[in-house]
Amino acid sequence: MAIDTDRGLQTQVIYSVYVRAHTPEGTFRAIIPDLDRIRSFGTDIIWFMPIHPIGVEGKKGSLGCPYANRDYRSVNPAYGTLEDFKALVDEIHARGMKAMIDVVYNHTSPDSVLYETHPEYFYHDAQGRPANRFGDWADVIDLDYSNRELWDYQIESLRYWAGIVDGFRCDVASMVPYGFWKAARTAVKQVNPACIWLAESIHLSMGCEARRLGFAAMRDSEAFDVFDLEYDYDIREVFDRLLHGRCPLSHWTDMLNYQEAIYPDNYNKMRCLENHDQPRIASIITDMEALVNWTAMLYFLKGTTLIYAGQEWADRHQPSLFEREPIDRETGMNLMPLMKKLAAAKKTLFTGEDSFWATADDARKLAVMERFSSRRHSVGVFSLLGESAKVKVPLPDGEYLNHIGGNTVRVEGGRLFCDGTPLLLCEEK
């Protein structure tokens, strides 16, 4: 983590909004009436997926992908005007929340303003054509950060937006040089000293493949020096295998413990069950009792919690990045009361100083997780199948309040009965 990172971020909740999909109108101003609801279940920060104009050349689908950015310094007219966006941010601030925007600094659309004015800022293949370095991203071309004038342009754009919003989610941050991010953080600090920096660090396999092909890819340990928090994609592939039954729960909990062992004391991983690049969790975990446990476990994990808009309704459909597909608010499911309790517990029981440990019962797919602070020892018990079981827990015998369900749980002989609902118990010091 950056030396000046606010550890309080670890107890906060980010809510990810795709403007096109969030309302039937798909505009900035249409989001304003929804802000009170978003805040009501514990949201601290709203992250907007890219708000900039989308390129036409090579676009995917009828509307194009928001990550094929045409102009870093303006907003997508389909969403509204810059004044509309500023009004939205003002309303977010009025409710005590913060706003972040996506910055896509690895690439642009082929017809971007930047390519039209400065083609020398871009990567070119062996035939001299603008291209992307690898991956199936036919609607974008990669930037070339060996050109220091590009740094100046990008940093000036960041300084501009830092005067409006509270932070940046940096797309494919690992593929942009460490030195650039370090310079950008220093420059932006002059405009907004409290700016939040979130890195979309890349999957382990993608980083290895990039280096195999001769391209630099920033490692997570480097990213922690200049970002406040980063994705947990270093172990996401293990998590995905767990979700689909291709590895035991203990493999993933071992990876969580490995992160705790190797990263700086103040490390912060953004934890999510789903995001715009991943399938909806409710499309995989279809049993509601099980989904409640997975959701409770998400909030217990060490790190900032991410909720992707629609997750609170257990929406099973992943909105297309290339079309207009409003999220489904009529699923008949409502996880917001649960999320409100979990967010409150995260803020009141956990701290940015906590240490973490996790164990697993593979046969019953049951996780027991611990958080340790100077004030309390917290234990979470999560039955990921939603089934009842007798569970061994690292707590003295006695009665404990379940901070999720509100019921009392008794520990006898170092064991308790889990009825299939998530448990959060605390031993005060």
PLM features per residue range, with description:
Residues 411-429:
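C-terminal beta-strand-rich structural cap/linker in extracellular carbohydrate-active enzymes
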Residues 267-333:
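Aromatic/acidic polysaccharide-binding cleft in carbohydrate-active enzymes
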Residues 13-15, 46-48, 99-101, 168, ...:
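Hydrophobic faces of well-ordered beta-strands that scaffold small-molecule active sites
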Residues 100, 167-173, 281:
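Short catalytic-loop micro-motif centered on adjacent basic/acidic residues
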Residues 359-395:
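Carbohydrate-binding surface patches
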Residues 171-264, 269, 297, 316-350, ...:
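Active-site-proximal helices and loops of the catalytic beta/alpha 8
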Residues 401-415:
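Solvent-exposed beta-strand/loop surfaces of large extracellular or lumenal domains
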Residues 2-15, 19-44, 50-162, 183-192, ...:
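Substrate-binding/active-site clefts of carbohydrate-active enzymes
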